[in-house]
């Protein structure tokens, strides 16, 4: 079980289609010559800019705001506590998550909701979920427009449902996601080939000059990392893997030593048994 958990951690985000092409964008602020720690919070318009400026290298890119746990209601009854993300229709092609039903472009519409297969089963049993109304926290109605395949537990960016930024802006009366001030979004990029990553990273500074005015005392650098690498570089992830690996090997060592000790402890009894058989006239082949 310990090694199974280690394997679970090491296989984070291997679920996505062609995971070697999927990358998380990291932003590093350089202020007064000092580099800050890279963070995964980015500008709301960054994915669209990357798609526009690097069409040959980038297959798709999307913005995700992760995540809120919300109570979902159907026909007045609380049905499920679910993790909901805010994104755009690019989310499925970028992450490589299979859409089972519905038109992906409808996710960008007001009050449209896409839900996972297991959430659809939980909410509506075997009934067709398309067109059904779901309430978020009993005060905001959304219409199910599509169903996507479940995202497994060992995924860094796991959600049960997703709705658009247009919907969130209407729900909270708050339009966000520009080039200034609100730098709190996850930017995921799917490259056409892994070798394109360094090319794009090298050209990011020139691209950003189109949108933000930097100076020698303050500017930003951008880099890319796979979701799996992002997960494994976290202190808590490394700690879990190290502790469980040490415990696992310790248990194996103790079990091995126990077997050796049991064998050694049985030697006197074995020798006594051999002696008795010898005294009784048994030959070597009969012992």
Positions of predicted regions on the chain:
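Exposed loop/turn and edge beta-strand positions of beta-sandwich/beta-sheet ligand-binding modules
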Residues: 109, 138, 183-185, 258, ...
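Membrane-helix interface segments
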Residues: 57, 78-79, 196, 237-239, ...
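Intracellular coupling helices
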Residues: 257-287
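Hydrophobic alpha-helical transmembrane segments of multipass integral membrane proteins
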Residues: 2, 249-256
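Juxtamembrane transmembrane-helix termini
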Residues: 7-17, 152, 261-264, 268
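Mid-to-C-terminal secondary-structure elements
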Residues: 85-101, 113-237
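Structured, solvent-exposed hinge/loop segments at the ends of secondary-structure elements
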Residues: 2-130, 136-143, 202, 209-213
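N-terminal membrane-entry
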Residues: 234-251
């Amino acid at each position: 079980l310990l090694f199974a958990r280690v394997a679970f951690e090491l296989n984070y985000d291997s679920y996505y289609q062609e995971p070697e092409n999927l990358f998380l964008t990291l932003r590093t602020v350089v202020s007064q010559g000092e580099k800050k720690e890279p963070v995964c919070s980015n500008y709301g318009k960054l994915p669209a800019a990357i798609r526009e400026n690097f069409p040959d290298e980038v297959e798709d890119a999307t913005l995700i705001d992760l995540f809120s746990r919300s109570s979902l209601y159907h026909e007045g009854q609380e049905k499920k506590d679910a993790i909901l993300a805010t994104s755009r229709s690019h989310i499925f092609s970028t992450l490589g998550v299979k859409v089972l039903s519905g038109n992906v472009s409808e996710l960008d519409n007001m009050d449209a909701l896409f839900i996972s297969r297991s959430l659809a089963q939980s909410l509506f049993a075997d009934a067709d979920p398309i067109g059904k109304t779901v309430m978020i926290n009993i005060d905001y109605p959304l219409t199910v427009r599509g169903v996507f395949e479940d995202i497994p537990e060992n995924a860094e960016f796991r959600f049960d449902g997703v709705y658009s930024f247009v919907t969130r802006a209407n729900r909270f009366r708050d339009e966000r996601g520009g080039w200034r001030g609100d730098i709190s979004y996850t930017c995921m990029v799917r490259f056409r080939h892994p070798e394109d990553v360094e090319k794009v990273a090298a050209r990011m500074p020139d691209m950003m000059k189109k949108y933000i005015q930097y100076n020698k005392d303050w500017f930003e650098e951008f880099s890319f990392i796979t979701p799996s690498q992002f997960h494994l570089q976290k202190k808590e992830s490394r700690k879990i893997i190290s502790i469980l690996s040490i415990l696992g090997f310790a248990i194996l060592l103790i079990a091995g030593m126990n077997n050796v000790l049991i064998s050694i402890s049985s030697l006197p009894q074995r020798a006594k048994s051999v002696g008795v058989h010898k005294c009784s006239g048994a030959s070597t082949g009969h012992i």
